[in-house]
From Swiss-Prot:
It comes from the Bacteria. Belongs to the UPF0297 family. This is UPF0297 protein LGAS_0422. PANTHER family: UPF0297 PROTEIN YRZL. The lineage of its organism: Bacteria, Bacillati, Bacillota, Bacilli, Lactobacillales. Signal peptide: none annotated. It comes from Lactobacillus gasseri (strain ATCC 33323 / DSM 20243 / BCRC 14619 / CIP 102991 / JCM 1131 / KCTC 3163 / NCIMB 11718 / NCTC 13722 / AM63). InterPro entries: IreB.
């Protein structure tokens, strides 16, 4: 049986945590480099949905926009509660 005949399984959630984590790290670093308070800016973005809270520096705005806000909040809550599984 060739590989084209087999049903492939794709688990979208498998890499979400790492991607969100890496994105938040990059955004945090970009905000810090620009002299902003990273926590305040990220919280402002998450609450309002306004990407203007995130600078274009180091492509931070485009990076964070690749994730839905609810997805980011979900990962933050999981991390905070130690439920990263």
């Amino acid at each position: 049986m060739s590989s084209l005949d087999k049903t492939m399984h794709f688990d979208f959630n498998q890499n979400k945590g790492k991607n969100v984590y890496d994105t938040l790290q990059d955004v945090y670093n970009a905000l810090e480099e620009k002299g902003y308070s990273p926590i305040n800016q990220i919280v402002g973005y998450l609450l309002s949905g306004d990407p203007a809270y995130i600078p274009r520096h180091n492509d931070a705005r485009n990076l964070i926009l690749k994730h839905e806000r609810d997805e980011i909040i979900e990962e933050l809550v999981k991390s905070y509660l130690g439920k990263n599984k």
